[in-house]
Regions:
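Well-ordered alpha/beta subsegment
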Residues: 202, 206-212
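Active-site region of the double-stranded beta-helix
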Residues: 1-197, 210-248
Length: 248
């Protein structure tokens, strides 16, 4: 595991414009089961929780739909803004994008194929590699004073990769939301999910997502992989699209 590449330490010019990996607690291994706790993932022989194992009834969340062209990049060199590598472009015919925000539930996450988990649940990760378990903090002005600054974060993005994620608030002060979406024939559907304390979002491999709009301290499982695609929202004249989260 390349911890130097894995650890994030992004800071802007504002006191709250940061995303920092505070700690790597350990790893979760393929084919093993873990109990979710605020102190990490605990190895167990218990059965996988039913709410994680079975698909839930689907409820369509508030969302935004638009057409876009996904333009990949061949650059796989990691940058300060993206530990995976370079970013391509998602070209859309808009200069602003407001993604509706909803509270995450098992039913509305199922619309995209993600899963709601809660403290105490037993889960198994869809992976063939060990995945680091981290504590990561995101400042309240990270989006405005780092992510959206072209020579720092490079602009709001969406991505997919072949590794799963877990995002779990570590206390009640967390806020913000996680963007999750899907696409078909260049038509994109996105929603922003608030994560209630005591719960988390499991994002399976290859699902469209972005976690930069979360705020606070989270237990996050993420990894470095060569099989990914990250794109920045841009208009046809290559200007950054102003992406924001709004009430549904």
């Amino acid at each position: 595991m390349d911890l130097d590449r894995l650890k994030v330490n992004r800071t802007g010019d504002h006191a709250q414009s940061f995303m920092i990996t505070d700690e790597v607690l350990g790893t979760v291994e393929p084919g093993k089961r873990y109990r979710i706790t605020l102190n990490g993932l605990v190895l167990t022989d218990a059965d996988i929780s039913q709410n994680f194992k079975h698909k839930r009834q689907v409820k369509t969340p508030a969302n935004i739909q638009f057409h876009g062209v996904w333009i990949t990049t061949e650059d796989t060199k990691a940058t300060d803004a993206n530990i995976l590598g370079g970013s391509g472009t998602l070209q859309i015919n808009q200069t602003e994008l407001c993604i509706p925000e909803v509270v995450a539930t098992a039913e509305n996450l199922s619309f995209y194929g993600a899963k709601l988990v809660q403290l105490g649940d037993i889960i198994e990760f869809e992976t063939t590699e060990a995945l680091p378990v981290t504590i990561t903090r995101v400042g309240s002005s990270y989006v405005e004073h780092y992510l959206k600054v072209e020579n720092k974060g490079g602009g709001a993005y969406i991505e997919y990769h072949d590794r799963p994620h877990l995002h779990l608030p570590t206390d009640k002060s967390t806020s913000g939301s996680m963007i999750i979406g899907h696409s078909f024939d260049n038509k994109y559907t996105l929603s922003a999910f608030k994560i209630p304390f005591g719960y988390g979002i499991y994002t399976p491999p290859n699902l469209l997502h972005a976690d930069a709009f979360l705020v606070g301290k989270f237990l996050v499982i993420y990894s470095v992989t060569e099989h990914f695609s990250t794109v920045i929202f841009r208009s046809p004249n290559h200007e950054l699209v102003d992406v924001n989260i709004g009430a549904s």
